[in-house]
């Protein structure tokens, strides 16, 4: 460990350097996403700095029912010196001590998290639709653009489905990319779970746009929402991080010209409070908002 390395709070003044770090590692964040992360976790965002500048970042977010670790990144030239461990400890320290802590790990980061007591909960796969993919699938079902008055319903549902109080990120995503914000509604005679059997949101990115979360009551509903979101894409790369357990939806993504890119591992470090369980229905999360947000 370099003696002149410091772990301190990440501030708005650091966003330019943090963006350069994430971009140099091939990450997708834009400056406004970094700013938004600082808004939701102003006392949980940390940076590792040397006299030469920022060499690492990590953010610990208090989502109410659990903590979330995001933006764990160390400059490749500085890896192997214990910096990731120090950043992880700082981010975990920003979360109330009784809460379980979750994160989405890459294969590279998983061994570090296992050393700190994180256990595998589930697996996901990042699916990428190339910029030169053909026309989007035909949209089916009762799907319409999500409007501002719908947000309160979506946030209430998302609280239950995700277990996280992440209204800030959801509202930000809606404002950032309304072209990916869709809601599936039942006809007047349909259903027993209100008039919202599904919704999706998305956001723009430096390299690709990201669609998620996708929440629906069936594979058909999830596919209808995803098809609508694909139709809103202007021809760039599009990413969906889908739960591996939803095999029919994963097959639909493949038919829609998405290609599997890499695995992600949803992990949890138990706390004194119980780990929120994933609801069994009627609404199901088919794709996550992203490793940054849970």
Segments from the language model and where they lie:
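Helix-loop element at the rim of GNAT/NAT acetyltransferase active sites that forms part
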Residues: 12-15, 20-32, 157-168, 233
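Active-site/acyl-donor-binding loops of N-acyltransferases
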Residues: 105, 116-134, 203, 213, ...
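Glycine/small-residue-rich loop that forms an oxyanion/phosphate-binding "nest" at active or ligand-binding sites
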Residues: 85-104, 108-110, 123-130
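Conserved acetyl-CoA-binding loop-helix of GNAT-fold acetyltransferases
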Residues: 74, 80-93, 115, 218-231, ...
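Conserved beta-strand in the GNAT
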Residues: 47, 52-61, 66-73, 192-204, ...
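Amide-forming acyltransferase catalytic core, primarily the GNAT-like/NAT-type
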Residues: 16, 118-210, 220-221
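Flexible loop/N-cap segments at domain edges
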Residues: 197-203, 209-242
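A short helix-loop-beta-strand connector motif used in the catalytic cores of GNAT acetyltransferases and
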Residues: 30, 36-56, 68, 100, ...
């Amino acid at each position: 460990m370099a003696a002149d390395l410091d772990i301190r709070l990440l501030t708005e003044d650091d966003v330019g350097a943090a963006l350069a770090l994430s971009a140099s590692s091939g990450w997708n964040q834009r400056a406004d996403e970094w700013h938004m992360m600082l808004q939701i976790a102003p006392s949980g965002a940390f940076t590792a700095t040397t006299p030469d500048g920022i060499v690492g970042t990590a953010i610990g977010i208090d989502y109410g029912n659990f903590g979330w670790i995001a933006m764990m990144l160390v400059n490749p030239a500085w890896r192997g010196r214990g910096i990731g461990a120090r950043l992880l400890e700082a981010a975990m320290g920003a979360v109330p001590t009784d809460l379980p802590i979750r994160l989405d790990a890459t294969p590279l980061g998983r061994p570090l998290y296992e050393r700190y007591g994180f256990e595998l909960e589930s697996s996901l796969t990042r699916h990428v639709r190339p910029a030169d993919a053909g026309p989007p699938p035909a949209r089916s079902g009762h799907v319409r653009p999500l409007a501002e008055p719908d947000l309160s319903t979506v946030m209430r549902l998302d609280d239950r489905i995700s277990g996280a109080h992440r209204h800030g990120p959801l509202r930000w995503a809606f404002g950032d990319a309304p072209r990916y914000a869709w809601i599936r509604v039942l006809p007047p005679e349909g259903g027993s779970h209100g008039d919202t059997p599904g919704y999706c949101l998305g956001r723009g990115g430096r390299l690709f746009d990201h669609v998620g979360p996708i929440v629906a009551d069936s594979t058909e509903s999830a596919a209808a929402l995803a098809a609508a979101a694909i139709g809103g894409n202007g021809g760039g790369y599009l990413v969906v991080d889908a739960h591996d357990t939803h095999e029919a939806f994963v097959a639909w993504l493949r038919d829609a010209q998405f290609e599997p890119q890499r695995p992600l591992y949803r992990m949890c470090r138990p706390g004194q409070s119980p780990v929120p369980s994933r609801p069994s229905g009627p609404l199901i999360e088919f794709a996550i908002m992203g490793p940054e947000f849970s």
